[in-house]
Curated annotation (Swiss-Prot):
Its EC number is 3.4.11.-. GO terms for biological process: peptide catabolic process; proteolysis. The record marks 438 as: Transition state stabilizer. PROSITE patterns: ZINC_PROTEASE. Keywords: Aminopeptidase, Hydrolase, Metal-binding, Metalloprotease, Protease, Zinc. This is Puromycin-sensitive aminopeptidase-like protein. Zn(2+) binds at residues 352, 356, 375. Binds 1 zinc ion per subunit. One of its GO terms (cellular component) is extracellular exosome.
Length: 478
């Protein structure tokens, strides 16, 4: 994920005012404009708070999720039906939940009667809910059902509303998601930890004149029985995935599409009337996927990849499985009014997020402590990819200015921190998305690559991705 600065840099302020800044400013400031950094690009380490991870006595196998957003009232209704494994007998289920009201909950052991929850104990500070049951849930598999409601918030996290203006000048809203680091719990009750993976069957009930997107391709679209103005859109089952990589979008979009040379359908969604501005990102993505496939010697595991420009988006971009979300300025290129530095920036952003489809999505770090591997690796290989696809950019010269030198300057400060930071409470996670994790992490990976040599480095990447695909890994595994 690329994150924007908390204290706006000069480049970020210019981005808000209009067209991208001139090349020199992009060269110096583009890194900090993508990341949630403090005034010097170095996050202050948070005070440690007591924290316990979710108990392991109940875990999900598959989550069937149906959401019905209301784009006028800014609310949503949801139904979760999770196939779960009870590993240790218990009379409660602890999940992550924030800013959501649970209406009903029940658990049905396989082949047995449904047991209705008798209480919901919200631990708001820890963003958890405990579902209490009147009898013990025995070991084995069963189905957890939860009905809930929530708000399409205006905080650009969780399931939120994004304001846009139609070509005719009308203000409307899209419903979009941003779940990294710990905000899937704001869209549905879930096991919102990187190490807990499940498959997802997602359905969206949306206005029939809106585009509905999610991680996988659409497998069914039919009229909604209770309202002739709505349709229910069902998506194919995802691979096993962590909750922070789940995504869905409902809005009005144009698109351009192509196929990469290895047969993956690539689609770029743009605001209505701006499809032409998505063609450069489409070209980059179509070149990037085969490069990573060849470099890792691991094929892209899904049939399609969607890239979409979001009007209101806090992050620079987010690598959701198969539905990568971007700020408009990080994805769209006006072919008549853009400079070379703008194209280079978009190429780097696309290269970064698509690298995560392998390094982060296919193989996921076990906990946020290992963020520097996830983001440091993507921040390095984005340059390798762009240099291969667009050698005329001479992009490695920008790495020295934008990452290597910046990492050295920040690491020399008294308030610097180790490249790997122990993380516990959710409030601590965002604090490590800084230039040490990204730029120093990328610089260390670059040194390792140069020391080992490209041939052996590629061999090691293949072994790592093959061994841990669809699983979690820690720094020691690499």
């Amino acid at each position: 994920m690329w994150l924007a600065a908390a204290a706006p840099s000069l480049a970020r302020r210019l981005l808000f005012l209009g067209p991208p800044p001139p090349p020199l400013l992009l060269l110096v400031f583009s890194r900090s404009s993508r990341r949630r950094l403090h005034s010097l690009g170095l996050a202050a380490m948070p005070e440690k708070r007591p924290f316990e991870r979710l108990p392991a006595d109940v875990s999900p196998i598959n989550c069937s999720l149906c959401l019905k957003p209301d784009l006028l009232d800014f609310t949503f209704e949801g139904k979760l039906e999770a196939a779960a494994q009870v590993r240790q007998a218990t009379n409660q289920i602890v999940m992550n939940c924030a800013d959501i009201d649970i209406i009903t909950a029940s658990y049905a052991p396989e082949g047995d009667e449904e047991i209705h929850a008798t209480g919901f104990n919200y631990q708001n500070e820890d963003e958890k809910v405990t579902l209490s049951f009147p009898s013990t849930l025995q070991t084995g598999t069963g189905t957890l059902k939860i009905d809930f409601v929530g708000e399409l918030n205006d905080k650009m996290k969780g399931f939120y509303r994004s304001k846009y203006t139609t070509p005719s000048g009308e203000v409307r809203y899209a419903a979009v998601t941003q779940f990294e680091a710990t905000d899937a719990r704001r869209a549905f009750p879930c096991w919102d930890e990187r190490a807990i993976k499940a498959t997802f069957d997602i359905s969206l009930v949306v206005p029939k004149d809106r585009v509905a997107l999610s991680n996988m391709n659409v497998i069914d679209r039919k009229p909604y029985p209770d309202d002739e103005n709505l349709v229910e859109v069902k998506f194919a089952r995802t691979p096993v995935t962590s909750t922070y990589l789940v995504a869905f979008v409902v809005g009005e979009y144009d698109f351009v599409e192509t196929r990469s040379k290895d047969g993956v359908c690539v689609c770029v969604y743009t605001p209505v009337g701006k499809a032409e501005q998505g063609k450069f990102a489409l070209e980059v993505a179509a070149k990037t996927l085969p490069f990573y496939k060849d470099y890792f010697n691991v094929p892209y595991p899904l049939p399609k990849i969607d890239l979409i420009a979001i009007a209101d988006f806090a992050a620079g971009a987010m690598e959701n499985w198969d539905l990568v979300t971007y700020r408009e300025t990080a994805l769209l290129i006006d072919p008549k009014n853009s400079c070379s530095s703008s194209r280079q920036w978009v190429a780097l952003v696309v290269g970064h997020e698509l690298a995560h489809q392998w390094f982060g999505n296919l193989v996921t770090m076990e906990w946020w402590t290992h963020l520097r591997l996830n983001e440091g690796f993507a921040s390095w290989i984005e340059y390798l990819c762009v240099d291969h696809c667009f050698p005329e950019y001479d992009i490695w010269t920008q790495f020295v200015s934008a990452d290597y030198t910046r990492a050295q300057e920040l690491d020399a400060l008294d308030n610097s921190h180790p490249i790997e930071v122990s993380v516990g409470h959710p409030s601590e996670v965002d604090e490590i998305f800084d230039a040490i994790s990204y730029s120093k992490g990328a610089s260390v990976i670059r040194m390792l690559h140069d020391y080992i040599g490209d041939k052996d480095f590629k061999k090691g990447m293949n072994m790592y991705l093959t061994k841990f695909q669809q699983k979690n890994a820690a720094a020691g595994n690499l």
